[in-house]
Swiss-Prot record:
Keyword Ribosomal protein in annotation: no
Matching InterPro entries: IF_conserved, IF_rod_dom, Intermed_filament_DNA-bd, Intermediate_filament
Positions of the UniProt region annotated as Linker 12: 253-268
Phenotypic consequence of R350P: In Kaeser syndrome and MFM1; incapable of de novo formation of a desmin intermediate filaments network; exerts a dominant negative effect on the ordered lateral arrangement of desmin subunits; may produce structural changes; forms subsarcolemmal aggregates
Consequence of changing T442I: In MFM1; reveals a severe disturbance of filament-formation competence and filament-filament interactions
Protein name: Desmin
Region described as Tail: 413-470
Effect of R406W: In MFM1; unable to form a filamentous network
Annotated effect of mutating A120 to E/R: Results in impaired filaments formation
Species annotation: Homo sapiens
Entry similarity comment: Belongs to the intermediate filament family.
PROSITE patterns per record: IF_ROD_1, IF_ROD_2
Length: 470
Protein backbone atom coordinates (compact mmCIF):
# COMPACT_ATOMS: atom_id res chain seq x y z
CA UNK A 1 0.00 0.00 0.00
CA UNK A 2 1.64 3.22 -1.23
CA UNK A 3 -0.35 5.64 0.86
CA UNK A 4 0.51 6.00 4.49
CA UNK A 5 -2.28 4.95 6.74
CA UNK A 6 -2.79 7.29 9.64
CA UNK A 7 -6.06 7.50 11.45
CA UNK A 8 -7.31 8.12 14.89
CA UNK A 9 -9.63 5.61 16.42
CA UNK A 10 -11.67 6.24 19.51
CA UNK A 11 -12.18 3.46 21.97
CA UNK A 12 -14.40 4.39 24.93
CA UNK A 13 -16.31 2.52 27.54
CA UNK A 14 -19.19 3.86 29.61
CA UNK A 15 -18.74 3.06 33.22
CA UNK A 16 -21.15 4.81 35.45
CA UNK A 17 -21.93 4.23 39.07
CA UNK A 18 -25.36 5.37 40.29
CA UNK A 19 -25.62 5.94 44.03
CA UNK A 20 -28.66 6.16 46.31
CA UNK A 21 -28.36 9.90 46.95
CA UNK A 22 -29.96 12.01 44.23
CA UNK A 23 -27.56 14.89 44.35
CA UNK A 24 -24.41 13.45 42.71
CA UNK A 25 -22.32 16.15 41.15
CA UNK A 26 -21.67 16.24 37.51
CA UNK A 27 -17.97 16.07 37.91
CA UNK A 28 -17.60 12.39 38.68
CA UNK A 29 -15.53 10.39 36.21
CA UNK A 30 -17.71 9.02 33.49
CA UNK A 31 -15.50 7.16 31.04
CA UNK A 32 -11.97 6.26 30.32
CA UNK A 33 -11.67 6.04 26.54
CA UNK A 34 -8.50 4.77 25.00
CA UNK A 35 -7.26 6.55 21.92
CA UNK A 36 -4.81 4.42 19.84
CA UNK A 37 -2.85 6.22 17.17
CA UNK A 38 -0.95 4.28 14.47
CA UNK A 39 1.34 5.81 11.88
CA UNK A 40 2.25 4.01 8.64
CA UNK A 41 5.04 5.15 6.34
CA UNK A 42 4.92 5.30 2.55
CA UNK A 43 6.31 2.80 0.18
CA UNK A 44 10.03 2.53 0.15
CA UNK A 45 10.55 4.19 3.47
CA UNK A 46 11.28 2.88 6.92
CA UNK A 47 8.98 4.12 9.70
CA UNK A 48 7.76 3.09 13.08
CA UNK A 49 4.17 2.59 14.22
CA UNK A 50 3.53 4.49 17.45
CA UNK A 51 0.45 3.90 19.56
CA UNK A 52 -0.40 6.02 22.57
CA UNK A 53 -3.03 5.29 25.16
CA UNK A 54 -4.76 8.31 26.78
CA UNK A 55 -7.02 8.32 29.80
CA UNK A 56 -9.78 10.83 29.37
CA UNK A 57 -11.81 12.01 32.34
CA UNK A 58 -14.64 14.53 32.52
CA UNK A 59 -14.57 17.03 35.30
CA UNK A 60 -16.96 19.80 36.12
CA UNK A 61 -15.91 23.18 37.27
CA UNK A 62 -19.47 24.34 37.80
CA UNK A 63 -22.97 23.10 38.32
CA UNK A 64 -24.09 22.83 34.71
CA UNK A 65 -21.00 22.70 32.50
CA UNK A 66 -20.33 19.92 30.11
CA UNK A 67 -16.82 19.56 31.35
CA UNK A 68 -13.49 19.42 29.57
CA UNK A 69 -11.55 16.55 28.17
CA UNK A 70 -8.19 15.79 29.65
CA UNK A 71 -5.86 13.16 28.35
CA UNK A 72 -2.72 11.82 29.84
CA UNK A 73 -0.25 9.60 28.12
CA UNK A 74 -0.01 6.28 29.81
CA UNK A 75 2.54 4.61 27.61
CA UNK A 76 4.07 4.48 24.16
CA UNK A 77 4.69 1.41 22.09
CA UNK A 78 6.69 1.48 18.95
CA UNK A 79 6.61 -1.32 16.45
CA UNK A 80 9.16 -1.01 13.70
CA UNK A 81 7.90 -1.80 10.30
CA UNK A 82 9.24 -1.10 6.87
CA UNK A 83 7.14 -1.04 3.82
CA UNK A 84 8.55 -1.18 0.44
CA UNK A 85 7.08 -1.29 -2.94
CA UNK A 86 5.61 -4.63 -3.63
CA UNK A 87 5.97 -5.81 -0.02
CA UNK A 88 3.06 -7.30 1.91
CA UNK A 89 1.74 -5.15 4.76
CA UNK A 90 1.24 -6.60 8.22
CA UNK A 91 -2.36 -5.78 9.23
CA UNK A 92 -2.29 -7.83 12.45
CA UNK A 93 -2.08 -4.72 14.60
CA UNK A 94 -4.89 -3.03 12.65
CA UNK A 95 -7.03 -6.16 12.91
CA UNK A 96 -6.44 -6.30 16.64
CA UNK A 97 -7.33 -2.64 16.97
CA UNK A 98 -10.43 -3.08 14.83
CA UNK A 99 -11.46 -6.16 16.81
CA UNK A 100 -11.02 -4.27 20.07
CA UNK A 101 -12.94 -1.32 18.63
CA UNK A 102 -15.82 -3.58 17.54
CA UNK A 103 -15.90 -5.26 20.95
CA UNK A 104 -15.87 -1.92 22.69
CA UNK A 105 -18.65 -0.59 20.45
CA UNK A 106 -20.72 -3.71 21.11
CA UNK A 107 -20.23 -3.34 24.85
CA UNK A 108 -21.08 0.33 24.59
CA UNK A 109 -24.29 -0.47 22.72
CA UNK A 110 -25.26 -3.04 25.36
CA UNK A 111 -24.47 -0.63 28.16
CA UNK A 112 -26.33 2.17 26.39
CA UNK A 113 -29.37 -0.08 25.98
CA UNK A 114 -29.23 -1.04 29.65
CA UNK A 115 -28.85 2.62 30.61
CA UNK A 116 -31.76 3.56 28.36
CA UNK A 117 -33.89 0.84 29.96
CA UNK A 118 -32.91 2.01 33.43
CA UNK A 119 -33.56 5.61 32.46
CA UNK A 120 -36.99 4.67 31.03
CA UNK A 121 -37.83 2.80 34.24
CA UNK A 122 -36.62 5.76 36.22
CA UNK A 123 -38.80 8.13 34.17
CA UNK A 124 -41.79 5.83 34.70
CA UNK A 125 -41.08 5.81 38.42
CA UNK A 126 -40.79 9.60 38.41
CA UNK A 127 -44.10 9.90 36.56
CA UNK A 128 -45.74 7.51 39.02
CA UNK A 129 -44.35 9.49 41.96
CA UNK A 130 -45.52 12.73 40.35
CA UNK A 131 -49.01 11.25 39.97
CA UNK A 132 -48.94 10.11 43.59
CA UNK A 133 -47.69 13.54 44.58
CA UNK A 134 -50.48 15.22 42.62
CA UNK A 135 -53.08 12.89 44.19
CA UNK A 136 -51.73 13.57 47.68
CA UNK A 137 -51.62 17.30 46.98
CA UNK A 138 -55.24 17.18 45.78
CA UNK A 139 -56.22 15.21 48.88
CA UNK A 140 -54.37 17.66 51.11
CA UNK A 141 -56.10 20.58 49.39
CA UNK A 142 -59.44 18.83 49.72
CA UNK A 143 -58.85 18.12 53.41
CA UNK A 144 -57.55 21.63 53.91
CA UNK A 145 -60.48 23.21 52.09
CA UNK A 146 -63.47 21.09 53.09
CA UNK A 147 -63.08 18.69 56.00
CA UNK A 148 -61.88 21.12 58.68
CA UNK A 149 -64.57 23.63 57.65
CA UNK A 150 -67.30 20.98 57.78
CA UNK A 151 -66.06 19.65 61.10
CA UNK A 152 -65.84 23.21 62.43
CA UNK A 153 -69.39 23.93 61.23
CA UNK A 154 -70.69 20.71 62.85
CA UNK A 155 -68.76 21.50 66.02
CA UNK A 156 -70.07 25.08 66.12
CA UNK A 157 -73.64 23.94 65.38
CA UNK A 158 -73.58 21.27 68.08
CA UNK A 159 -71.92 23.72 70.46
CA UNK A 160 -74.66 26.29 69.77
CA UNK A 161 -77.32 23.61 70.40
CA UNK A 162 -75.62 22.62 73.64
CA UNK A 163 -75.40 26.25 74.71
CA UNK A 164 -79.08 26.75 73.91
CA UNK A 165 -80.02 23.69 75.96
CA UNK A 166 -77.79 24.89 78.78
CA UNK A 167 -79.52 28.29 78.68
CA UNK A 168 -82.97 26.61 78.72
CA UNK A 169 -81.96 24.39 81.65
CA UNK A 170 -80.43 27.40 83.40
CA UNK A 171 -83.67 29.36 82.97
CA UNK A 172 -85.70 26.40 84.22
CA UNK A 173 -83.39 26.02 87.18
CA UNK A 174 -83.61 29.76 87.92
CA UNK A 175 -87.41 29.58 87.75
CA UNK A 176 -87.45 26.55 90.05
CA UNK A 177 -85.05 28.35 92.41
CA UNK A 178 -87.36 31.39 92.46
CA UNK A 179 -90.38 29.17 93.17
CA UNK A 180 -88.43 27.36 95.86
CA UNK A 181 -87.39 30.69 97.41
CA UNK A 182 -91.00 31.88 97.32
CA UNK A 183 -92.17 28.66 98.93
CA UNK A 184 -89.42 28.94 101.53
CA UNK A 185 -90.53 32.52 102.24
CA UNK A 186 -94.13 31.36 102.56
CA UNK A 187 -93.00 28.54 104.79
CA UNK A 188 -91.00 30.92 106.97
CA UNK A 189 -93.96 33.28 107.16
CA UNK A 190 -96.30 30.44 108.07
CA UNK A 191 -93.80 29.19 110.63
CA UNK A 192 -93.63 32.67 112.16
CA UNK A 193 -97.42 32.87 112.15
CA UNK A 194 -97.58 29.40 113.68
CA UNK A 195 -95.18 30.50 116.39
CA UNK A 196 -97.35 33.54 117.05
CA UNK A 197 -100.45 31.37 117.19
CA UNK A 198 -98.67 28.95 119.51
CA UNK A 199 -97.70 31.87 121.73
CA UNK A 200 -101.29 33.12 121.67
CA UNK A 201 -102.45 29.60 122.47
CA UNK A 202 -100.04 29.41 125.37
CA UNK A 203 -101.20 32.82 126.59
CA UNK A 204 -104.83 31.69 126.26
CA UNK A 205 -104.02 28.48 128.10
CA UNK A 206 -102.26 30.51 130.79
CA UNK A 207 -105.25 32.85 131.00
CA UNK A 208 -107.52 29.83 131.06
CA UNK A 209 -105.46 28.33 133.86
CA UNK A 210 -105.63 31.65 135.71
CA UNK A 211 -109.36 31.82 135.06
CA UNK A 212 -109.67 28.26 136.26
CA UNK A 213 -107.85 29.22 139.42
CA UNK A 214 -110.17 32.20 139.80
CA UNK A 215 -113.16 29.97 139.06
CA UNK A 216 -111.90 27.46 141.58
CA UNK A 217 -111.38 30.24 144.09
CA UNK A 218 -114.83 31.62 143.30
CA UNK A 219 -116.31 28.13 143.55
CA UNK A 220 -114.60 27.63 146.87
CA UNK A 221 -115.78 31.04 148.00
CA UNK A 222 -119.28 30.22 146.80
CA UNK A 223 -119.20 26.88 148.61
CA UNK A 224 -117.87 28.63 151.70
CA UNK A 225 -120.57 31.24 151.43
CA UNK A 226 -123.17 28.54 150.86
CA UNK A 227 -121.90 26.79 153.93
CA UNK A 228 -121.93 30.04 155.84
CA UNK A 229 -125.43 30.69 154.52
CA UNK A 230 -126.45 27.23 155.66
CA UNK A 231 -124.82 27.82 159.01
CA UNK A 232 -126.48 31.22 159.23
CA UNK A 233 -129.78 29.66 158.19
CA UNK A 234 -129.26 27.01 160.82
CA UNK A 235 -128.27 29.72 163.28
CA UNK A 236 -131.31 31.76 162.27
CA UNK A 237 -133.47 28.68 162.61
CA UNK A 238 -131.83 27.97 165.91
CA UNK A 239 -132.27 31.56 166.97
CA UNK A 240 -135.86 31.40 165.79
CA UNK A 241 -136.32 28.26 167.81
CA UNK A 242 -134.60 29.83 170.77
CA UNK A 243 -136.60 33.00 170.27
CA UNK A 244 -139.76 31.01 169.93
CA UNK A 245 -138.83 29.03 173.02
CA UNK A 246 -138.07 32.23 174.81
CA UNK A 247 -141.30 33.67 173.47
CA UNK A 248 -143.14 30.64 174.55
CA UNK A 249 -141.40 30.74 177.88
CA UNK A 250 -142.12 34.44 178.08
CA UNK A 251 -145.69 33.81 177.03
CA UNK A 252 -145.87 31.05 179.58
CA UNK A 253 -144.36 33.37 182.10
CA UNK A 254 -146.70 36.09 180.95
CA UNK A 255 -149.62 33.80 181.25
CA UNK A 256 -148.43 32.77 184.65
CA UNK A 257 -147.85 36.40 185.47
CA UNK A 258 -151.28 37.27 184.08
CA UNK A 259 -152.69 34.56 186.21
CA UNK A 260 -150.72 35.89 189.06
CA UNK A 261 -151.80 39.41 188.11
CA UNK A 262 -155.28 38.33 188.00
CA UNK A 263 -154.72 36.60 191.16
CA UNK A 264 -152.63 39.31 192.52
CA UNK A 265 -153.57 42.72 191.22
CA UNK A 266 -150.77 44.21 193.03
CA UNK A 267 -148.26 43.91 190.12
CA UNK A 268 -149.56 46.03 187.18
CA UNK A 269 -146.14 47.06 185.64
CA UNK A 270 -144.90 43.55 184.74
CA UNK A 271 -147.00 43.22 181.61
CA UNK A 272 -145.79 46.48 180.27
CA UNK A 273 -142.21 45.51 180.97
CA UNK A 274 -142.69 42.22 179.21
CA UNK A 275 -144.32 43.97 176.33
CA UNK A 276 -141.40 46.32 176.06
CA UNK A 277 -138.93 43.46 176.23
CA UNK A 278 -140.85 41.54 173.58
CA UNK A 279 -140.91 44.55 171.38
CA UNK A 280 -137.21 45.06 171.83
CA UNK A 281 -136.48 41.42 171.08
CA UNK A 282 -138.71 41.44 168.03
CA UNK A 283 -137.08 44.64 166.82
CA UNK A 284 -133.63 43.19 167.37
CA UNK A 285 -134.60 39.87 165.75
CA UNK A 286 -136.17 41.62 162.75
CA UNK A 287 -133.14 43.84 162.43
CA UNK A 288 -130.79 40.86 162.59
CA UNK A 289 -132.89 38.91 160.13
CA UNK A 290 -133.03 41.81 157.69
CA UNK A 291 -129.31 42.45 158.01
CA UNK A 292 -128.54 38.76 157.56
CA UNK A 293 -130.85 38.58 154.55
CA UNK A 294 -129.32 41.72 153.01
CA UNK A 295 -125.78 40.48 153.62
CA UNK A 296 -126.68 37.06 152.29
CA UNK A 297 -128.37 38.61 149.23
CA UNK A 298 -125.42 40.91 148.60
CA UNK A 299 -122.94 38.07 148.97
CA UNK A 300 -125.04 35.80 146.77
CA UNK A 301 -125.37 38.61 144.22
CA UNK A 302 -121.62 39.25 144.27
CA UNK A 303 -120.86 35.55 143.98
CA UNK A 304 -123.44 35.20 141.20
CA UNK A 305 -121.96 38.13 139.31
CA UNK A 306 -118.43 36.76 139.80
CA UNK A 307 -119.57 33.30 138.73
CA UNK A 308 -121.34 34.75 135.69
CA UNK A 309 -118.28 36.81 134.84
CA UNK A 310 -116.04 33.79 135.26
CA UNK A 311 -118.44 31.66 133.23
CA UNK A 312 -118.45 34.29 130.47
CA UNK A 313 -114.63 34.47 130.53
CA UNK A 314 -114.43 30.69 130.58
CA UNK A 315 -116.89 30.41 127.71
CA UNK A 316 -114.99 33.06 125.76
CA UNK A 317 -111.69 31.32 126.53
CA UNK A 318 -113.17 28.01 125.41
CA UNK A 319 -114.46 29.64 122.24
CA UNK A 320 -111.08 31.24 121.56
CA UNK A 321 -109.37 27.95 122.30
CA UNK A 322 -111.67 26.20 119.82
CA UNK A 323 -110.93 28.88 117.25
CA UNK A 324 -107.21 28.53 117.94
CA UNK A 325 -107.49 24.78 117.59
CA UNK A 326 -109.28 25.17 114.25
CA UNK A 327 -106.63 27.65 113.11
CA UNK A 328 -103.84 25.34 114.29
CA UNK A 329 -105.46 22.43 112.44
CA UNK A 330 -105.84 24.53 109.28
CA UNK A 331 -102.26 25.80 109.59
CA UNK A 332 -101.05 22.26 110.21
CA UNK A 333 -102.88 21.03 107.11
CA UNK A 334 -101.50 23.96 105.11
CA UNK A 335 -97.99 23.30 106.41
CA UNK A 336 -98.33 19.62 105.53
CA UNK A 337 -99.53 20.59 102.04
CA UNK A 338 -96.64 23.05 101.67
CA UNK A 339 -94.23 20.42 102.94
CA UNK A 340 -95.57 17.99 100.34
CA UNK A 341 -95.30 20.66 97.64
CA UNK A 342 -91.79 21.53 98.81
CA UNK A 343 -90.79 17.86 98.82
CA UNK A 344 -92.19 17.38 95.32
CA UNK A 345 -90.42 20.54 94.10
CA UNK A 346 -87.18 19.46 95.75
CA UNK A 347 -87.55 16.04 94.15
CA UNK A 348 -88.22 17.66 90.77
CA UNK A 349 -85.24 19.96 91.30
CA UNK A 350 -83.02 16.99 92.16
CA UNK A 351 -84.30 15.14 89.10
CA UNK A 352 -83.65 18.22 86.97
CA UNK A 353 -80.18 18.58 88.47
CA UNK A 354 -79.44 14.89 87.87
CA UNK A 355 -80.77 15.11 84.32
CA UNK A 356 -78.88 18.33 83.75
CA UNK A 357 -75.70 16.74 85.15
CA UNK A 358 -76.17 13.65 82.96
CA UNK A 359 -76.89 15.77 79.88
CA UNK A 360 -73.96 18.03 80.70
CA UNK A 361 -71.70 14.99 81.09
CA UNK A 362 -73.02 13.65 77.78
CA UNK A 363 -72.39 17.00 76.13
CA UNK A 364 -68.92 17.10 77.66
CA UNK A 365 -68.30 13.61 76.28
CA UNK A 366 -69.54 14.75 72.86
CA UNK A 367 -67.32 17.83 73.06
CA UNK A 368 -64.35 15.68 74.08
CA UNK A 369 -65.14 13.25 71.25
CA UNK A 370 -65.39 16.08 68.74
CA UNK A 371 -62.17 17.61 70.04
CA UNK A 372 -60.54 14.19 69.77
CA UNK A 373 -61.82 13.89 66.19
CA UNK A 374 -60.55 17.39 65.43
CA UNK A 375 -57.20 16.54 66.96
CA UNK A 376 -57.13 13.28 64.98
CA UNK A 377 -58.00 15.19 61.79
CA UNK A 378 -55.29 17.73 62.58
CA UNK A 379 -52.83 14.89 63.15
CA UNK A 380 -53.94 13.32 59.86
CA UNK A 381 -53.56 16.68 58.14
CA UNK A 382 -50.14 17.17 59.69
CA UNK A 383 -49.19 13.64 58.63
CA UNK A 384 -50.41 14.35 55.10
CA UNK A 385 -48.48 17.60 55.13
CA UNK A 386 -45.36 15.79 56.31
CA UNK A 387 -45.86 13.17 53.61
CA UNK A 388 -46.47 15.96 51.12
CA UNK A 389 -43.29 17.68 52.30
CA UNK A 390 -41.39 14.41 52.04
CA UNK A 391 -42.79 13.90 48.56
CA UNK A 392 -41.82 17.46 47.68
CA UNK A 393 -38.32 16.78 48.93
CA UNK A 394 -38.22 13.52 46.97
CA UNK A 395 -39.61 15.33 43.93
CA UNK A 396 -36.99 18.05 44.24
CA UNK A 397 -34.28 15.45 44.66
CA UNK A 398 -35.67 13.55 41.68
CA UNK A 399 -35.82 16.76 39.66
CA UNK A 400 -32.20 17.44 40.55
CA UNK A 401 -31.28 13.87 39.65
CA UNK A 402 -33.25 14.08 36.38
CA UNK A 403 -31.50 17.33 35.54
CA UNK A 404 -28.20 15.68 36.39
CA UNK A 405 -28.99 12.69 34.18
CA UNK A 406 -30.22 15.00 31.43
CA UNK A 407 -26.99 16.95 31.50
CA UNK A 408 -25.03 13.70 31.57
CA UNK A 409 -26.98 12.36 28.60
CA UNK A 410 -26.64 15.62 26.70
CA UNK A 411 -22.91 15.62 27.39
CA UNK A 412 -22.59 12.00 26.30
CA UNK A 413 -24.71 12.58 23.20
CA UNK A 414 -22.69 15.64 22.26
CA UNK A 415 -19.48 13.70 22.87
CA UNK A 416 -20.68 10.66 20.92
CA UNK A 417 -22.01 12.71 18.00
CA UNK A 418 -18.69 14.54 17.50
CA UNK A 419 -16.89 13.38 14.34
CA UNK A 420 -13.71 11.42 14.62
CA UNK A 421 -11.77 14.29 13.06
CA UNK A 422 -12.70 16.47 16.02
CA UNK A 423 -11.05 14.02 18.38
CA UNK A 424 -8.04 13.78 16.11
CA UNK A 425 -7.72 17.54 16.14
CA UNK A 426 -7.82 17.74 19.90
CA UNK A 427 -4.67 19.02 21.49
CA UNK A 428 -4.02 16.51 24.21
CA UNK A 429 -1.63 17.70 26.78
CA UNK A 430 0.19 15.29 28.95
CA UNK A 431 -0.30 15.68 32.67
CA UNK A 432 0.99 13.80 35.60
CA UNK A 433 -1.35 11.98 38.07
CA UNK A 434 -0.44 14.55 40.73
CA UNK A 435 -1.56 17.42 38.47
CA UNK A 436 -4.79 15.58 37.56
CA UNK A 437 -5.57 14.98 41.19
CA UNK A 438 -5.03 18.66 41.96
CA UNK A 439 -7.14 19.90 39.03
CA UNK A 440 -10.12 17.55 39.37
CA UNK A 441 -12.78 19.10 41.59
CA UNK A 442 -16.52 18.67 42.00
CA UNK A 443 -19.29 20.89 43.22
CA UNK A 444 -22.02 19.57 45.50
CA UNK A 445 -25.30 21.45 45.89
CA UNK A 446 -27.55 20.72 48.89
CA UNK A 447 -31.05 22.18 48.86
CA UNK A 448 -32.79 22.51 52.26
CA UNK A 449 -36.50 23.22 52.19
CA UNK A 450 -38.17 24.19 55.48
CA UNK A 451 -41.97 24.13 55.83
CA UNK A 452 -43.47 25.38 59.10
CA UNK A 453 -46.97 24.17 59.98
CA UNK A 454 -49.27 25.30 62.75
CA UNK A 455 -52.51 23.47 63.60
CA UNK A 456 -52.29 21.54 60.35
CA UNK A 457 -51.82 24.65 58.16
CA UNK A 458 -48.68 25.77 56.33
CA UNK A 459 -47.43 28.97 57.96
CA UNK A 460 -44.15 29.61 56.18
CA UNK A 461 -41.99 27.92 53.58
CA UNK A 462 -38.28 28.62 52.97
CA UNK A 463 -35.70 27.14 50.60
CA UNK A 464 -31.94 27.30 51.20
CA UNK A 465 -29.12 26.09 48.96
CA UNK A 466 -25.66 25.15 50.17
CA UNK A 467 -22.75 24.68 47.76
CA UNK A 468 -19.77 22.54 48.65
CA UNK A 469 -16.69 22.08 46.49
CA UNK A 470 -15.17 18.61 46.83
Amino acid sequence: MSQAYSSSQRVSSYRRTFGGAPGFPLGSPLSSPVFPRAGFGSKGSSSSVTSRVYQVSRTSGGAGGLGSLRASRLGTTRTPSSYGAGELLDFSLADAVNQEFLTTRTNEKVELQELNDRFANYIEKVRFLEQQNAALAAEVNRLKGREPTRVAELYEEELRELRRQVEVLTNQRARVDVERDNLLDDLQRLKAKLQEEIQLKEEAENNLAAFRADVDAATLARIDLERRIESLNEEIAFLKKVHEEEIRELQAQLQEQQVQVEMDMSKPDLTAALRDIRAQYETIAAKNISEAEEWYKSKVSDLTQAANKNNDALRQAKQEMMEYRHQIQSYTCEIDALKGTNDSLMRQMRELEDRFASEASGYQDNIARLEEEIRHLKDEMARHLREYQDLLNVKMALDVEIATYRKLLEGEESRINLPIQTYSALNFRETSPEQRGSEVHTKKTVMIKTIETRDGEVVSEATQQQHEVL
